[in-house]
Amino acid sequence: MEHQNAVKEALNALYHHPDDTVRVHADRWLQNFQGTLDAWQVADNLLHDSSSNLETLIFCSQTLRSKVQRDFEELPPGAFQKLRQSLTTLLKKFHKGPPKVRTQISIAVAALAVHVPAADWGDGGIISWLRDEMHMHPEYVPGFLELLTVLPEETFNYKIAARPDRRRQFEKELTSQMEAALSILSACLKISELKEQVLEAFASWLRLRHGIPGTVLACHPLVHAALSSLNCDPLSEASVNVISELIHHTASPSSGGISAQTPLIQVIVPQILSLQAHLRDSSKDEEDVKAIGRLFADVGDSYVELIATGSDEPMVIVHALLEVTAHPEFDIASMTFNFWHSLQLMLTKRESYSSLGSEASIEVERNRRLHIFQPAYQSLVSLVGFRVQYPEDYQGLSYEDLKEFKQTRYAVADVLIDAALILGGDTTLKILYMKLLEANAQTGNNFQDWRPAEAILFCIWAISNYVSVVEAEVMPQVMALLQNLPQQAQLLQTACLLVGAYSKWLNAAPASVSILPSIIRILMSGMGTSEDCAAAAALAFRHTCDDCRKNLCGYFEDLFNIYCMAINGGGGYKVSAEDSLNLVEALGMVVTELPLDQAKGALEKLCFSAASPLEEAAKEDLEKKHARELTVHIDRFAFLFRYVNHPEAVAAEINKHWAIFRVIFDARPWDMRTMESLCRACKYAVRTSGRYIIDTIGEMLEKIQFHYQQHHQPCFLYLSSEVIKIFGSDPSCAVYLKNLIETLFAHTTCLMTSIKEVTARPDIADDCFLLASRCLRYCPHLFIPSPIFPALVNCAMIGITVQHREACHSILTFLTDIFDLEKSVNEEQFVRIRDNIIIPRGATITRILIASLAGALPSSRLDTVTYSLLALTRTYRLQAVSWAKESVSLIPRTALTETESTKFLQALSDIAYGADVNSLIGQVEELSDVCRRNRTVQELVQAALKPLELNLVTAPVS
């Protein structure tokens, strides 16, 4: 009674106490209570207690359901019968509700069935038991019907802590009882008030995708009951669910596919098509129309392969789907978008025609089908284009409404791409251009209402990748039209995006040189209109300079003046610091096309404009500057060094401006943001310049080493990584590179001597082990014989179970690279050193990896951990299997059975003998599933494997 009263008091506090602190405390207490062994009896008692209020009933039913799902193994052997009896009594007690309580009890019984083999329920398993209960207690049928509904749903509920073998067995038990379950449902149809509930249960059983013959379902009373309900007003939601599941059932390979289900298809499809008139009925309830649209979309998605053949009968479905697409409500129309995409793939992908054999036959059939469907896709272009038009009240749209509108536009853009792939981009462009002319004519040929024109320009933007660069009929007129648009922000923004999207066309156009100045003026206008428009214009400027760089070489001074005005805010430009980087990149691409002498002068001007503000700042107190005041200029250096592909010119500039870089390094090594920006600029300078930067690299590395030991900035590591990539194999750099990596790694290993320290510095761990992998690849001769190598392996072992995704991935990748050393460095002395380090640690590494698979790391990391274990096993073969056997033997048999561990070890042994990786993946997933099936088991496994207990050893390097 004490626990029961405590639960009631906590629930009362949770729902009724005015103090938030008290409510939070009560909620936490109740959550903790649900995990206790006492929760079984307390929840059961309170559910049977007639004085319990609704809040108590809901909480206790959820608790009991959760306990059965997750903690069934807590109960002593033989508890099943008593638990089943109690749950059955509760199901009867709540057969009329409350619905939430009845549902939770039903799920609890279904979860019990997942745990307990069919034989324990008596002959025929739970279905026969359920049938008998319904016969003996017909007054409780509604409660039992809900149980019958949730049973197949629980087959795929991974909250239930069942072993994989038992879960598969349960699915087989249910599918073998499909006929009996449908028989029970058919009998319940006679009770008219239960019809909706019966149909929902039928839909649930159909989701098992069991191969019931189409001839059987075609004349089944449950199917006919669902079809007859389609004509009800309002439409029966349960009947729609049944018909939807029947459609999916007929297309499922496990049901024999469309050919085997033809009798059923011939019954349901005509019934669905007969609903087409309702799509045009404005008096019809919107939810009913949505349900009808869903059925048409299901038919299209499920039978797309048949429809794509182009035969006459399926074309009726295509015309019906066009009608759904035409519906004014976007939520209804968009249901068909997936069909149009799937059909496009079926019509264009070569795999769809592989059975035809010869290329000639494939081409003939492909053209025949495309010809058949082109009218439908032409209609599609007209039907979706208007949906991207800004609403009249667009200025009053909330943030969420504007976000939804943008999502609508991108969804329509995808449909237009599908149409362009069927019709050809040039044909689609012509259709859209005609719409543009119509829109212009309707508004008096001067775009008084800008919204229709903007919508069509957006559509033209969407298909840009599919319009030929030699298209000469429409695009010249579109580009001419852009020059006469009114200065409206959204319209100009879309015009700028369109210019950027068609930059390749601009470059290929015969009149490119004469068009470009007017195009640049459009972009300049965009930069001064609004921030969003300026962002689009800057992006378009980048694309235009990228693709038209040769034609723009002679305009560098003009482009530079535009750039200067934009970054200084002159001319009313509204380009943000971030968007200005697009302009930097744009000019960098043009400079790349200049001859070296001219490029040096151009780059010098650009770098001077970036360096001047930094030098002015250096005259003041750099330490007091806000990071953004510096990084905005340093980032421009980074983009110039990255995109100007003149190594000698870039080297000259980094050498010239190294003095200001050095000053910033020394003044703000504590400032992560500034250091990241500075290291990024140096990284691109190193990458582009290569050996031309050799005079500066030594001092750069000295700065990195010195400041890293003081301030531990991760960016110093990734800059070092770039240096290793470029200079790692250069003998003249060997001395200071060896000093660099030993200094950096020695300091890093001192920072990360426990998992707690790795967790506190995930960025350092990430960049450290990325650098280590680079060293293995580019300078193994400096790294592997180094005394720091074994210390770094120890550090990696410490950090394997770090929860930070990128850090964990870098650590595991580094270890995998060591195990796979022969793939990149096949030198015996290095392999011997590697073995001397790994073999003494092999058992511990294997134990940590298996612990990671079994729950020490999230299941999303399974692939990365598996690959590390795979590499270890392929290198050390049976020795690795022995390590794994030793680790697996630590796991208690209550958590992992002998059979389950044997399967895993056998798969690992097969890998040692050269088997394919797929043979291991399945068993890894099984091991992971079993060991994570509930919190108790997971904690038991981790306590046995002790992934944080490292047993580190000191081994000789050679």
Curated annotation (Swiss-Prot):
GO cellular component, one term: nucleus
Top-level taxonomic group: Eukaryota
Pfam families assigned: IBN_N (PF03810), TPR_TNPO3_IPO13_2nd (PF24138), TPR_TNPO3_IPO13_3rd (PF24140), TPR_TNPO3_IPO13_4th (PF24139), Xpo1 (PF08389)
Main location group: nucleus
Family matches, as SMART domains: IBN_N
InterPro entries, alphabetized: ARM-like, ARM-type_fold, Exportin-1/Importin-b-like, Importin-beta_N, Importin_beta-like_NTR
Compartments (UniProt record): Nucleus
GO biological process: protein import into nucleus; regulation of RNA splicing
Keywords, in A-Z order: Nucleus, Protein transport, Transport
Gene Ontology MF terms in the entry: small GTPase binding
Disruption phenotype: Semi-dwarf phenotype.
Limits of the Importin N-terminal domain: 26-93
Subunit-level organization: Interacts with RS2Z33, RSZ21, RS31A, SR34 and RAN1.
Function: Functions as a nuclear import receptor for serine-arginine rich (SR) proteins. Regulates nuclear import of SR proteins that are required for proper splicing of the two resistance (R) genes SNC1 and RPS4, a crucial step for their functions in plant immunity.
Protein family according to the UniProt entry: Belongs to the importin beta family.
PANTHER family the record matches: IMPORTIN-13, TRANSPORTIN 3 AND IMPORTIN 13
Protein name per UniProt: Transportin MOS14
